[in-house]
């Protein structure tokens, strides 16, 4: 069980969006590397980074900011947004990323994801972003007819390190994680699932530690951390206690 702090990059800055809308971006820190260091100092063990411009462009846009983050923190970093080819994947992993997150390409070209898992075992995650229960692609700008579980099951046995499941309808608006759909996905596949979108308060952290939620690899928090709705020490202490109880 891991709490992943999120750094979403837009135009080189650390921002949060509301409902995935690039026009509704709030800048939380103009220096993403400093934010990465701060999260490490607070005791977080991982970092979740998204290149928002890259997700729309289909290629890396905030590469300099990501490189600065990698230099600033010793924590493992996972990155999504605009990573669409084996060359992109290899390039980023060689630059120090722990794992890449493949989203749009997982819908458009599942075979590439399977090949990437074979070539880079344990270092490829799949990002499934859903709106109204259907998978969205191209930086959430396009909806598909593909169901969440249907897509996830395509990667059973492929060696996907994790599925990052984001409920777009809740992202950045602090209404709480959609536990029903997240746990339904976790029950449907053997791949570890990370919850994203809507984490709002310590209530969600406590919910994470309940027995039925401990099948999850963890959850991602963005705005709730930046707005001070979650106390990092209290949250991490709760999660550590839950881990001990699971041993």
Swiss-Prot record:
Single GO molecular function: 1-(5-phosphoribosyl)-5-[(5-phosphoribosylamino)methylideneamino]imidazole-4-carboxamide isomerase activity
Gene3D superfamilies linked to this entry: Aldolase class I
The reaction(s) this protein catalyses: 1-(5-phospho-beta-D-ribosyl)-5-[(5-phospho-beta-D-ribosylamino)methylideneamino]imidazole-4-carboxamide = 5-[(5-phospho-1-deoxy-D-ribulos-1-ylimino)methylamino]-1-(5-phospho-beta-D-ribosyl)imidazole-4-carboxamide
Keywords carried by this UniProt record: Amino-acid biosynthesis, Cytoplasm, Histidine biosynthesis, Isomerase
SUPFAM superfamilies attached to this UniProt entry: Ribulose-phoshate binding barrel (SSF51366)
Annotated GO biological process: L-histidine biosynthetic process; L-tryptophan biosynthetic process
Pathway: Amino-acid biosynthesis; L-histidine biosynthesis; L-histidine from 5-phospho-alpha-D-ribose 1-diphosphate: step 4/9
Entry keyword Amino-acid biosynthesis: yes
Positions annotated as active site in the UniProt record: 8, 129
EC numbers: 5.3.1.16
Transmembrane helix recorded as keyword: no
GO cellular component: cytoplasm
Location within or outside the cell: Cytoplasm
Family listed: Belongs to the HisA/HisF family.
Name this protein carries in UniProt: 1-(5-phosphoribosyl)-5-[(5-phosphoribosylamino)methylideneamino] imidazole-4-carboxamide isomerase
UniProt source species: Rhizobium meliloti (strain 1021) (Ensifer meliloti)
